[in-house]
Amino acid sequence: INPQGSIGWHGAGMQPVFFKNLVSKLGLEIQVFRVGTYKSAVEPFIATEMSPANREQMTECLESVWNRIQADVSDSRHIPTDTLNAYADRYMDFCQAEEYVQCGLADTLMYKDEVISYLKQLSGRDEDDKLNSLFIEDMINVKKNVPKDKSGNVIAVYYAYGEILDAPGSSTEDCIDVQKMCKGLRKLRDNDDVKAVVLRVNSPGGSAYGSDQIWREVVRLKEKKPVIVSMGDYAASGGYYISCAADRIFADPTTLILSAYSA
């Protein structure tokens, strides 16, 4: 850790924002057709606080994520989970850097130039040698330089990231264009060189109609070749809908798999 750095070890939490009073002051009325006790996405517009059902599910979600984080850190840093909880209760976010080392959350204090020197030692390089390195964003361009596979045995990876939209318009945020994705899945279905497809899903859901159209294309794709879903941070609502037609689904222990939306 940098001598002037910090580690935000203070547990997990969330703070929802509610707009009901604002909506009332503006003279607006929100009309909601809601199905299911735990369908909570519209609560910010119709309530001033969390419903018991939503608080229950959000608490369970946070506890699951926090327990997983604790378990992983405990295994890697060899610190008991009770001790990690005690550190979090102290809100270890504004401590002196030395304290993180004393607590076992960091090994030592180093500035960036010292880290580079340390890496050179680990790799057997001289101090004057250049250390070749890549930032994560540099990896984006790697696939552009990979020769096209001509073996006729390709495993395709299709990324389904963002909200599912029937008509994305001019949105600059990551989104799943329903028509574009359906067309892409059809191309993979008809490509004889593609022997299997990995569908990487990281989506909060979106259009129910659009999700159903994508689901249909996944079903048709699976008729000709295996389809495996790999879930990212979340696969909620329509995100899970488009995933459930796959042959196999793999998710991280902290992946949010839920349905939170109302019609």
Question: Which ranges hold each PLM region?
Answer:
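Short, contiguous alpha-helical
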Residues: Y100
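A non-catalytic alpha/beta surface segment that caps or lines the substrate-entry region
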Residues: M110-E114, L119
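Small-residue-centered hinge/linker elements
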Residues: N2-D89, F94, A106, K120-V229, ...
